[in-house]
């Protein structure tokens, strides 16, 4: 696979950054187009990547998934 060969055949036509996978290029292109297809159902925030929306949703749910290793606080 391309992961270990360093091959990056997918190039951004705007900034010429290269990617190993076509879907990485498609996600990157949203930075140039301003497209933000992932919308928060609780507020007006919009996101380029679904992972950023999932992280943002914790603001509304109060979820704090990472505990401190020293004091067990989240």
UniProtKB/Swiss-Prot annotation:
Gene3D superfamilies: Classic Zinc Finger. It is found in: Nucleus. GO terms for cellular component: nucleus. Keywords: Developmental protein, DNA-binding, Gap protein, Metal-binding, Nucleus, Repeat, Zinc, Zinc-finger. A zinc finger (C2H2-type) spans 1-4, 10-32, 38-60, 66-74. InterPro entries: Znf_C2H2_sf, Znf_C2H2_type. This is Protein krueppel. It comes from Apis mellifera. The gene is Kr.
């Amino acid at each position: 696979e391309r992961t270990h060969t360093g091959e990056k055949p997918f190039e951004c036509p705007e900034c010429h950054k290269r990617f190993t996978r076509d879907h990485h290029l498609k996600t990157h292109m949203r930075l140039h187009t301003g497209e933000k297809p992932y919308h928060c159902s609780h507020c007006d925030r919009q996101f380029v990547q679904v992972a950023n929306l999932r992280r943002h949703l914790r603001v509304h749910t109060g979820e704090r998934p990472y505990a401190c290793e020293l004091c067990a606080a989240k």
